[in-house]
UniProtKB/Swiss-Prot annotation:
GO terms for biological process: proton motive force-driven mitochondrial ATP synthesis. GO terms for molecular function: ATP binding; ATP hydrolysis activity; proton-transporting ATP synthase activity, rotational mechanism. PANTHER family: ATP SYNTHASE, ATP SYNTHASE SUBUNIT BETA, MITOCHONDRIAL. This is ATP synthase subunit beta, chloroplastic. It is an enzyme of class 7 (translocase). Keywords: ATP synthesis, ATP-binding, CF(1), Chloroplast, Hydrogen ion transport, Ion transport, Membrane, Nucleotide-binding, Plastid, Thylakoid, Translocase, Transport. The lineage of its organism: Eukaryota, Cryptophyceae, Pyrenomonadales, Geminigeraceae, Guillardia. GO terms for cellular component: chloroplast thylakoid membrane; mitochondrion; proton-transporting ATP synthase complex. It is a peripheral membrane protein. It is found in: Plastid, Chloroplast thylakoid membrane. Its EC number is 7.1.2.2. It catalyses: ATP + H2O + 4 H(+)(in) = ADP + phosphate + 5 H(+)(out).
Length: 475
């Protein structure tokens, strides 16, 4: 950020991450302007949030306010926080201010953009809904993603969220020539580090040639002040917007975790003197969420498809934070611990995951019928499981036994080997087109493959591989 401004003020009050500054000249910075306290490595950047009157402004710090004191000089940069964008960001890790934090040298600042920008105009939006093919069978068939849509990713610890995220990053790069931006918002530093290491291992980040990497990472972790956690999502979004608007690419934007964005806003809200709203959240909750979510969309040039991990506090879906998030989502991908325990990966729950795209007028009759028949078979199997547990399979009618056999094949066929998991599964990854996916499930539902053993459907790509696997199992 260039320090061309000469508008100088002085700190009058510090309350945690909130700093009050008086500009004696009477020339006040605009809302969202970045102001800098100190210089060099110890410089503290704050963002103006309120104009208090009497030539004073209230700002929220993006870094720790330790060591600041009243009377210190403050410089108005006369512009919002700006971050680097473009190819130089790929393979690198940034903080909320767009500074690299991976000890791999500086990033070229040829192109920077402010993190506060308007959403695209109505005339620029792509209004025709289209499916974003991921190459992952269970997602494309049962809960398809909308191009330029927002997807909620729900799942506890250890059920495969990270691996699913990395596979999506890999597939968008290979199939769509797109890139991804990962925004780590208020999550554990250890998880951020693990993700970075796994991305290097699976070649999503190419260490020898960073420009060939498929992702840029932006972190504002749990130990950072609320100001950083509140704005890091916007930093990641700004980098994604450049790839969409200038490079005209399809972009995947991951936000982990969207709840922490709201949480950071509520921490700052009371310090800014706002009256708390329901459950202690900020009164501006819907506005803040809307200003972030409305920028995530498809334009006629490219698209940003966002996948947001959603933490649900105390599993209460009516809590204002997740409830506000739900109103923006086009699809939900729910990861199931039961499926993970069975070794079925990706552990996406086919009955709990939903999508607004699964409508006849969008996906067509064939896709819709296939998806509904798969869900119907799995639902019936779920209902029969109690009877099977108590009385055994032999007590079922012939028709029910056939449903159970097909449902078990469907369940296994919903599993799939991932490219990014080759390192630890030893089996090559598979990208399965939607046409191949539908062909396979229709053959199972029609009874064409009733004689094949169910293990031949486990961890394969398309249905031809399952038939080949069955032959090799027979030996």
């Amino acid at each position: 950020m260039t320090n061309t401004a000469t508008n100088i003020g002085y700190i009058t009050q510090i309350i945690g991450p909130v700093v009050d500054v008086e500009f004696t000249t009477g020339k006040l910075p605009q809302i969202y302007n970045a102001i800098i306290i100190g210089s060099g490595e110890n410089a503290v950047t704050c963002e103006v949030q309120q104009l208090l009157g009497n030539n004073k402004v209230r700002a929220v710090s993006m870094t720790s306010t330790d060591g600041l004191k009243r009377g210190m000089e403050v410089t108005d940069t006369q512009a919002p926080i700006s971050v680097p964008v473009g190819k130089a960001t790929l393979g690198r890790i940034f903080n909320v201010l767009g500074q690299p934090v991976d000890n791999m040298g500086d990033v070229a600042l040829d192109q920077t953009l402010p993190i506060h920008r308007g959403s695209p105009a109505f005339t620029q939006l792509e209004t025709k809904p289209s499916i974003f093919e991921t190459g992952i069978k269970v997602v494309d068939l049962l809960a398809p993603y909308r191009r330029g849509g927002k997807i909620g990713l729900f799942g506890g610890a250890g059920v495969g969220k990270t691996v699913l995220i990395m596979e999506l990053i890999n597939n968008i790069a290979k199939a769509h020539g797109g890139v991804s931006v990962f925004g780590g918002v208020g999550e554990r530093t250890r998880e951020g580090n693990d993700l970075y290491m796994e991305m290097k291992e699976s070649k999503v980040i190419n260490e020898s040639n960073l420009g060939e990497s498929k992702v840029a990472l932006v972190y504002g972790q749990m130990n950072e002040p609320p100001g950083a956690r509140m704005r890091v999502g916007l930093t990641a979004l700004t980098m994604a917007e450049y790839f969409r608007d200038v490079n005209k690419q399809d972009v995947l934007l991951f936000i982990d975790n969207i709840f922490r964005f709201v949480q950071a806003g509520s921490e700052v809200s009371a310090l800014l003197g706002r009256m708390p709203s329901a459950v202690g959240y900020q009164p501006t909750l819907a506005t803040e969420m809307g200003s972030l979510q409305e920028r995530i969309t498809s334009t006629t040039e490219g698209s940003i498809t966002s996948i947001q991990a959603v933490y649900v506090p105390a599993d209460d879906l009516t809590d204002p934070a997740p409830a506000t998030t739900f109103s923006h989502l086009d699809a939900t991908t729910v990861l199931s611990r039961n499926l993970a325990a069975k070794g079925i990966y990706p552990a996406v729950d086919p009955l709990d995951s939903t999508s607004t795209m699964l409508q006849i007028n969008i996906v067509g009759q064939e896709h819709y019928s296939c998806a509904q028949n798969v869900k119907e078979t799995l639902q019936r199997y779920k209902e029969l499981q109690d009877i099977i547990a108590i009385l055994g399979l032999d007590e079922l009618s012939e028709e029910d036994r056939q449903i159970v056999a097909r449902a078990r094949k469907i369940e296994r066929f919903l599993s799939q080997p991932f490219f990014v998991a080759e390192v630890f599964t030893g089996s090559p990854g598979k990208y399965v087109s939607l046409a191949d996916t539908m062909k396979g499930f229709n053959m199972i539902l029609n009874g064409e493959l009733d004689e094949l053993p169910e293990q031949s459907f486990y961890l394969v790509g398309n249905i031809d591989e399952a038939i080949e696997k069955a032959k090799s199992l027979k030996g």
